[in-house]
Design a protein with these regions (language model features):
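General "foldedness" signal
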Residues: 50, 63-65, 71-74, 98, ...
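Aromatic-enriched hydrophobic runs in primary sequence
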Residues: 11-16, 31, 59-61, 103, ...
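Structured interaction and signal-relay segments at domain junctions
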Residues: 41-106
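Short amphipathic alpha-helical segments, especially helix-boundary/capping motifs
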Residues: 9-14, 96, 100, 123-125
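Juxtadomain coupling helices with adjacent low-complexity linkers
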Residues: 2-35, 39-41, 133-172
Length: 172
């Protein structure tokens, strides 16, 4: 088993444990969405951003340079977060570790589910996953990392303890 996958999975579990909210509402979503937009703009990149409590859209923004494909990727990543209550990137690495896919393991169609970085669970401390923060537009590990960076700042958690190291391969 690849030790970098194992260490990334441990870091992803820590992120999901530490980056939980005491409360979350439409104002929280608006502020986080705005911070995500600013973080991406500071990098000179473009993404689509979606924040939802499952079934209730709270924030959406498609930056100039994104396409309808980014919106579909968001939907598919969000479906993974909702079904598994984990980040879409954690699910990608879990399946890679097992050398399988969602289609092979559970029969889930690729048209509705994608295990790619950029979907992160909204979880109230001590509670279930209630929604997802999802972005699409940059490489998947970077999509995931931008969300973690903004959430760590918002929740006053040390990014140095939560950020993933740079990827070793071009796939992530």
């Amino acid at each position: 088993m690849d030790s970098s996958i194992e260490s990334d999975l441990a870091r992803l579990a820590l992120q999901e444990e530490q980056l939980q909210f005491e409360t979350f509402n439409a104002d929280t979503a608006w502020q986080l969405g705005t911070l995500l937009k600013q973080a991406v703009e500071a990098r000179g990149k473009a993404v689509a951003i979606d924040i939802q409590l499952f079934g209730q859209p709270l924030f959406f923004y498609a930056m100039p340079g994104t396409t309808p494909d980014n919106i579909d990727w968001i939907r598919r990543k969000r479906n993974v977060v909702q079904r598994f209550q984990r980040s879409s990137y954690a699910m990608r690495l879990e399946l890679r570790k097992k050398q399988t896919t969602l289609t092979e393991q559970l029969g889930l169609p690729l048209r509705d589910y994608v295990v790619a970085g950029g979907g992160f669970p909204i979880r109230l401390r001590g509670s279930a996953c209630i929604g997802a923060i999802t972005i699409s537009g940059v490489p998947m590990r970077e999509d995931h990392g931008i969300i973690v960076e903004v959430l760590a700042s918002w929740l006053n958690r040390p990014l140095s303890e939560l950020a993933l190291p740079p990827a070793d391969d071009m796939d992530d």
